[in-house]
Regions:
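Hydrophobic alpha-helical and helix-loop surface patches within well-folded domains
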Residues: 1-258, 262-265, 397-398, 413-414, ...
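Non-catalytic accessory/interaction domains
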Residues: 2, 88, 152-155, 177, ...
Length: 476
């Protein structure tokens, strides 16, 4: 449903396709048919939320559900995950509802996780987890390093406290930690536990213990230590490689784990089940040679399975993105990233590296100038539009919040010049062409840039649709 004046913009075919795919996925995965009879989706004018999971009637902000100008695939992925997020709430939140707000994560973290899982497995948007990593997980990292950080499962004294916890921790960190829980107990056991949970508590109210009891029953594992360290403590750990080389082979590779910087004084070192990947330059591409899975704990864990392996061009901790931690790299890997990041042939692995570059800049370990230079070079060959869009958002923050004010104009010029070149080389009518045009408009600063904007408005870029959206970018 939408306003009559918006009917011409409604992409009913895509919305209904994604909706049907979500229903089929959730009913099969959760082992329980949709419980509420009807299911309506309404685009609401000037809505004060992105969307809301009312039983049988989901309400969306118009701009979430309806596109009035041409958009990139990233917007379609975002819409699909929002549709599936609200649909997942029919089970997580409506069929089974938290008893009190300290278990907000039973609603939001699960809906966030379920939406990206379902979109990546049931729709054509197979790289949805890359979008999560590029945009949502970065949100979690930022919020989790502020003085206002809090545990995923945290006490809520009143409704004012509740309002402050609808944040990147309750949504994106929670979803990422659920990925770690899936790795910890195994996917089949995790899904079995969810089915037991829904069957036992349908139309009831629950606490964290109710869910954990069913996951323990399904997996045969005591999850008390896991809950204590992952759900009851705040902050994000950092994982670094410690590498010893013997000739052209690894004598040893170990993973050093550092405690969170926030909360101040935290000494929390968590257990992680993760993969470590080795990647090699093969012609123009950077490809995965091998990836080993292991459990790490404490300050230092050796990856014994990689001892004796030939030295790789890139070592990636948390390959396949099963855990929640900031990542760092050895010198050889950094050199490889500078030359071949955009040529790495796995989008999720690239997303992990892009995220690490960004939080290295945010943490002051990588200068703004170096971040911009590395990123602009990699963007030349970056194929995932979610990564491209996220990087340009991060350029804005880096230049306006982190850079030396005396260097801002030079950095904006550098970004605009590189983006103009990328725009000239982009395929006509492509998502990249549209994203580069918008980014160029945001960073244009010199007289030559302004002349280029006039040319764009007059149709100089073949295939670029000059609609209201791109005009706003140019004029504002």
């Amino acid at each position: 449903y939408a306003r009559k004046s918006f009917f011409k913009y409604v992409d009913a075919e895509n919305v209904f396709e994604v909706t049907k795919q979500g229903f089929a996925y959730f009913e099969k995965t959760f082992g329980l048919a949709y419980p509420f009879g009807k299911y309506d989706q309404i685009a609401v004018a000037e809505y004060n939320w992105g969307a809301m999971e009312n039983v049988g009637c989901v309400t969306f902000h118009e701009d979430v559900l309806i596109f009035r100008s041409k958009v990139t695939e990233r917007n379609y992925v975002s819409r699909a995950t929002t549709i599936h997020h609200e649909m997942a709430h029919m089970w997580f939140g409506d069929l089974v509802t938290m008893k009190w707000w300290e278990d907000l994560w039973l609603n939001e973290s699960f809906a966030e996780w379920a939406s990206y899982q379902s979109v990546s497995e049931s729709t054509k948007y197979k790289e949805a987890w890359t979008e999560f990593n590029s945009l949502r997980k970065n949100w979690a990292y930022r919020v989790d390093q502020l003085t206002t950080t809090h545990p995923i499962a945290t006490e809520m004294e009143d409704l004012d406290a509740v309002r402050t916890n609808f944040d990147g921790i309750s949504y994106a960190k929670g979803a990422s930690v659920l990925q770690q829980l899936v790795a910890h107990v195994g996917r089949d056991n995790f899904i079995k536990g969810l089915r037991l949970y829904f069957a036992k508590h349908a139309y009831g109210n629950t606490t964290l213990k109710d869910l954990i009891d069913q996951l323990e029953a399904a997996s045969g594992r005591d999850l008390t230590p896991w809950v204590s360290t992952w759900l009851r403590t705040a902050g994000v750990n950092t994982l670094r490689p410690v590498i010893a080389v013997d000739g052209d082979s690894y004598k040893s590779i170990s993973i050093k784990q550092e405690a969170p910087t926030m909360p101040v004084g935290s000494k929390e070192l968590r257990p992680h089940r993760l993969h470590v990947g080795l990647f090699d330059i093969q012609g123009e591409k950077l490809s995965r040679r091998t990836s080993v899975e292991l459990d790490i704990a404490g300050a230092l864990t050796e990856v014994t399975a990689l001892a004796g392996q030939k030295v790789a061009d890139l070592v990636l901790i948390n390959d396949k993105d099963q855990t929640y931690a900031k990542l760092r790299f050895d010198d050889r890997s950094i050199a490889t990233m500078k030359s071949h990041l955009g040529k790495l042939d796995d989008s999720l692995a690239r997303g992990l590296i892009w995220a690490s570059l960004w939080d290295s800049c945010r943490d002051g370990e990588l200068s703004t100038s170096d971040y911009v230079a590395i990123a602009l070079n990699a963007l030349k060959t970056e194929s995932d539009i979610s990564i491209v869009a996220a990087t340009y958002l991060q350029f804005e923050t880096a230049i306006w919040a982190y850079a030396n004010p005396a260097k801002r104009d030079a950095l904006r010029t550098q970004v605009a010049d590189a983006t103009a070149a990328a725009l000239a080389n982009a395929a006509p009518g492509s998502d990249h062409q549209m994203q580069f045009a918008r980014a160029f408009a945001n960073n244009a600063i010199t007289p030559a840039h302004l002349e280029k904007l006039k040319e764009i408005l007059n149709g100089s870029e073949k295939g670029l649709v000059i609609d209201a959206e791109i005009r706003w970018y140019i004029f504002i």
